[in-house]
Amino acid sequence: MAKFVFVTGGVVSSIGKGIVAASLGRLLKSRGYSVSILKLDPYLNVDPGTMSPYQHGEVFVTEDGAETDLDLGHYERFTDTAMSRLNSVTTGSIYQSVINKERRGDYNGGTVQVIPHITGEIRERIHRVASNSNADVVITEIGGTVGDIESLPFLEAIREFRGDVGRHDLAYIHVTLLPYIGTSGELKTKPTQHSVKELRSIGIQPDVLVCRSDREINAELKRKIGGFCGVHERAVIPSLDADSIYAVPQTLEEQGLCREVLDVLNLTDHDSDMRAWQQLVHKMRNPGPAVKVALVGKYVQLNDAYLSVVEALRHACLAQDASLDLHWVCAEEIENRGADALLHGMDAVVVPGGFGNRGVDGKVAAIRWAREQRIPFLGLCLGMQCAVIEWARNLAGLTDATSAELEPGTSHPVIHLLPEQQDVVDLGGTMRLGVYPCRIAEGSMADRLYGDEVVYERHRHRYEFNNAYRNLFLESGYRISGSSPDGRLVELIELPEHPFFTACQYHPEFLSRPGQPHPLFRGLIEAAQQRLPNSPSEIKATA
């Protein structure tokens, strides 16, 4: 039977609950326990798929095609465990399910209420993750901050959860902030005390407190916090600001987080094997020469909009003994100032996914610059579509070529709507989503990088390469290096005469891990390293 851990947050938002949950997952796995982590998000959207990246950040896509919160990316990268649509729950999806049941008559004419119907549905979702994953421990992160009206049904549900399982089958972790007041030279505990008081008023007594701080928390302060909050001193876990999120698991291990949780859950504290993770963190803190990578995007004002892309670049640099010097470049600025003004001196260019017309011409200009200057280039999803548009306009003489998404009446729709999308009306959850196979062309650069005949990648798109232009594309010197098994869908393209010019319709960033960088990102960094002074004469072979 699974054990359950609930992670709540107090004092301020964005306190780091997701990293704490992911770190605990990593520590439990290092002791041989299997883990699944889910996120309860208190917004009324059914999922984040139609939300603006400026408001929500990246949409992370799971293997089974769920559009989820970016925290699921942290869960997967830290635990190296694939999550599913069951691991992402929103208030909107809960209410949708309950209302659908009411319409079907499932409640036999009863009055449908927040308690017990909404809270019962929330509890059922948590149990469903446990039964489907067969995990030893299910960790649940509750979004929002204790005290928010939106979070109350979730907090009530996890309070009720005690009645579903035994006392030693669940643990409550509360993540708080200890602010430092410079004029008094003190870390203040009162906000944490009030946050725990609020949690207790709901009926939840935390077992462990994780206290965020920018400086050391001494033993006296831990005793004070424990005394006022009803938590043993050893269960007050300091979490100091770290230079990397990947350093957090080891910090929390040293402070005894996993030991305390296992004690509450009455589980054996097996020996932990964190050696590989420690080596990764050591390499991060002792990197090699920097590679300058330009990320040309539409939403660069909010870095979280491209979180998995940035992490994939970091993983690749880690594997290549390089440090990442990332330059955020607004695609619209390229339209105003020109590509060379903003990209000169870069060792590589990445154009990630996105939607809509804004900034597309800037992305196309950046791709042309990378092609003509022979700078390593990687395009992702819309980035591949922009690479095809750039080819059509500048090499095939189709000056008005574009995507049917951007200009439905274009005379040269080199990118067009997937046939199965023709009759789709709703926006949410209706794209080509999740894992699909891709057959790699023998002898291609992709073949060298992947080393597999068929790979499985995650997708999120409605539009595709228009096969009416396939022959013209191939005659221009480009190569289709990856396609659907039936050959119908173009998944991966490359330019053989270029040092590294490749673009894919899928999202490889979602499969990159700290110890297992995605082959396309590693290939990009390998190629970028060849531009550095004193670079080796040959690109290192991909492991």
UniProtKB/Swiss-Prot annotation:
Q: Which stretch is the leader sequence?
A: none
Enzyme class, broadest EC rank = ligase
Q: Which GO terms describe its molecular function?
A: ATP binding; CTP synthase activity; glutaminase activity; identical protein binding; metal ion binding
PROSITE patterns assigned? GATASE_TYPE_1
* Binding site residues for ATP: S14, I15, G16, K17, G18, I19, D71
The GO biological-process annotations, alphabetized, read as: 'de novo' CTP biosynthetic process; pyrimidine nucleobase biosynthetic process
Q: Where is this region: Amidoligase domain?
A: 1-267
The record's listing under Pfam families reads: CTP_synth_N, GATase
Residues recorded as binding UTP, renumbered to this chain, are: S13, K188, T189, K190, P191, T192, Q193, K224
Q: Which residues bind CTP?
A: S13, D148, I149, E150, K188, T189, K190, P191, T192, Q193, K224
So where does this one cross the membrane? none
User: Which family does the record claim for this protein?
Assistant: Belongs to the CTP synthase family.
The record's section on PANTHER family has:
CTP SYNTHASE, CTP SYNTHASE-RELATED
Which miscellaneous remark does the UniProt record hold?
Answer: CTPSs have evolved a hybrid strategy for distinguishing between UTP and CTP. The overlapping regions of the product feedback inhibitory and substrate sites recognize a common feature in both compounds, the triphosphate moiety. To differentiate isosteric substrate and product pyrimidine rings, an additional pocket far from the expected kinase/ligase catalytic site, specifically recognizes the cytosine and ribose portions of the product inhibitor.
- The molecule here is called CTP synthase
- Give the species: Synechococcus sp. (strain WH7803)
